[in-house]
């Protein structure tokens, strides 16, 4: 009789160890949508990715809008001349109502003489 209870105790302890190694099943009453068995819910993951990417998209859109505004400004200010993207981005930051001459460091010179001798 004592042997039987000892075997039952060993079997019970083995079941307990085995149950510890198995993943716990999700409680049906739990409302944690973030993870099941340590795996993130795909809808929650998509939200995380969207939140991480959103500032990048907004920054890219702002930069693109700034370049377009600068190109428009260059075209009006310099009689239809076009600007490269970097110049357009710089011009977009100027005050559009200020028609005074801007400091030379804001202009991009492509003239070899100016670049060689460094007048500015």
Swiss-Prot record:
PTM text: The proteolytic cleavage of the internal scaffolding protein B releases the scaffold protein in order to continue virion assembly.
Pfam families per record: Phage_B (PF02304)
Composition-biased stretches (Basic and acidic residues): 24-36, 48-64
Group of enzyme by EC: hydrolase
Gene Ontology cellular-component terms listed: host cell cytoplasm; viral scaffold
Protein task: Participates in the assembly of the viral procapsid in the cytoplasm. Forms first a 12S pre-assembly complex with protein H, and F and G pentamers, then twelve 12S complexes are joined by the D protein to form the procapsid. Internal scaffold protein B is released from the procapsid upon genome packaging. Autoproteolytic activity cleaves protein B and probably facilitates its removal through the pores of the procapsid.
Sequence similarity: Belongs to the microviridae B protein family.
Protein name listed in UniProt: Internal scaffolding protein B
Organism: Enterobacteria phage phiX174 (Isolate Sanger)
């Amino acid at each position: 009789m004592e042997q039987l209870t000892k075997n039952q105790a060993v079997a019970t302890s083995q079941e307990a160890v085995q149950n510890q190694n198995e993943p716990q099943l999700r409680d049906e009453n739990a409302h944690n949508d973030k993870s099941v068995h340590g795996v993130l819910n795909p809808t929650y993951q998509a939200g995380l990715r969207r939140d991480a990417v959103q500032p990048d998209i907004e920054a890219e859109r702002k930069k693109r809008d700034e370049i377009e505004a600068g190109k428009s400004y260059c075209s009006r200010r310099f009689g239809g001349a076009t600007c490269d993207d970097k110049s357009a981005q710089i011009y977009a930051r100027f005050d559009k109502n200020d028609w005074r001459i801007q400091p030379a460091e804001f202009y991009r010179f492509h003239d070899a003489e100016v670049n060689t001798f460094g007048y500015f």
